[in-house]
Amino acid sequence: MDKQTRVSNVTLRPIGQDDLELIFTHQQDPIASQLAQFPSREREAFYLHWQQNILGQASVLARGIEVDGLLVGNIGHWHMDGQAMIGYWIDRAFWGRGVATLTLSAFLPLVNSRPLFAHVAQHNVASQRVLLRHGFVKMDRLIQEENDTAPLFEFVLA
């Protein structure tokens, strides 16, 4: 598929143990990790995190993002420090094709929590645009999360 080809449809589905190896590979991409401003986890830490904090938590809504039957990323909703959060990760091969926009359009109706927060790297302009397009508002404060390498912009959907 040509890098410039826009994606016309995404499918969201539950994430299973069999998906973790590909999700692990996605988060190992150094360019994606730098853009997300989130360091990649080593294999053991990654699997432990996903099994205990994501797949093992009934309060977490995690979905795989598929394009034409191929798992190209994941999106999730969880609570952190009393805030309802949302975040996603998309395989770099699918950047710039509208996957994030379609994914948020499909995922937001599944999340009833409001306000809903997202934290985005200051240099990740594409993700900032996707959030703004979906009604999120950029707040006038920076957030420093535990694993992040620098402060992040905070966005909120009321």
Residue spans for each PLM region:
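Acyl-donor (CoA/ACP) binding surface of acyl/acetyltransferases
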Residues: 1-30, 35, 62-158
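Conserved GNAT-fold acetyl-CoA-binding loop/helix
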Residues: 31-51
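Short loop/turn motifs at secondary-structure junctions and domain boundaries
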Residues: 53-59
